[in-house]
Design a protein with these regions (language model features):
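Helix-start/capping segments and mature chain N-termini
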Residues: 1-77, 81-235
Length: 235
């Protein structure tokens, strides 16, 4: 069967894979980036051959969930899962504020830029499994930044990456191997950021001019430090 997306086919999609959207809801229930989250969710559903439920039906489920959660009145992390059938599941958690300037380091693991699943936010993320465990054990770090086989910056395990170069904020293009984040899309559309490959060496020569973004935290400064130890949490 021909794939609906280059490099993907029915056999390539692991069993029980779901699409994910992780969204911020304000204490008043506002979700400023909801339309961008829905755009990405439905675009990936089509690419992966998932059922594509009506956009307004998904929106209504999200809005009703946020309105009814006992955690409302706080900043929330709202997690949406959608399986191949198009069925949506929602969970909410309180979202603590960031404190200080978060730390990041360069991951010792490399990504392969042609990997098609990098451009879709799904539960199939084996290349990030050790990083997520490591971050749990190292709460001072917000994320690890990944490089690809060309020694170019890709993304963090839960964020997009930006570097100030010659007075302009740049972020890697999707062809470097990364997820198109909702904040990244907003920044590109507004002209605050431009796409350009970022060689790994540039991170080391501009360590104080680095930002990350994601749908929960927005766009924020981080501090690059040396990676401490090994990625495998058992070492």
């Amino acid at each position: 069967m021909e794939s609906p997306h280059p490099g993907l086919s029915d056999m390539d999609i692991p069993l029980n894979t779901s699409l994910i959207e992780t969204m911020h809801a304000s204490p008043t229930g506002e979700m400023a980036l909801l339309d961008l989250h829905l755009d990405r969710l439905l675009r990936s559903a089509q690419a992966l051959g998932f059922a594509n439920p009506p956009r307004e039906s998904i929106r209504r489920q999200i809005v009703e969930h946020v309105a009814c959660t006992p955690l409302k009145g706080s900043d929330l992390r709202v997690r949406l899962l959608m399986g191949p059938s198009g069925k949506v599941a929602l969970e909410s958690y309180t979202l603590p504020p960031l404190t200080g300037v978060p730390l990041v380091a360069i991951s010792p693991v490399r990504l392969k830029s042609p990997e098609p699943f990098l451009q879709h936010k799904t539960t199939y993320r084996p290349w990030y499994a050790d990083t997520m465990s490591w971050l749990t054990d190292h709460p001072d770090f917000f994320d690890l930044i990944y490089l690809n086989e060309k020694n170019e910056v890709c993304e963090g395990s839960r964020s997009n990456v930006y570097l100030m170069q010659d007075g302009v904020w740049v972020t890697p293009p999707l062809t470097c191997g990364l997820l198109g984040g909702v904040v990244r899309r907003q920044l590109l559309a507004s002209g605050q950021v431009v796409e350009k490959p970022i060689p790994a060496a540039s991170l080391l020569t501009h360590p104080g001019q680095l930002r990350l973004s994601n749908g929960l935290r927005g766009w924020f400064d981080v501090q690059l430090v040396d990676f401490p130890g090994k990625l495998n949490r058992n070492n």
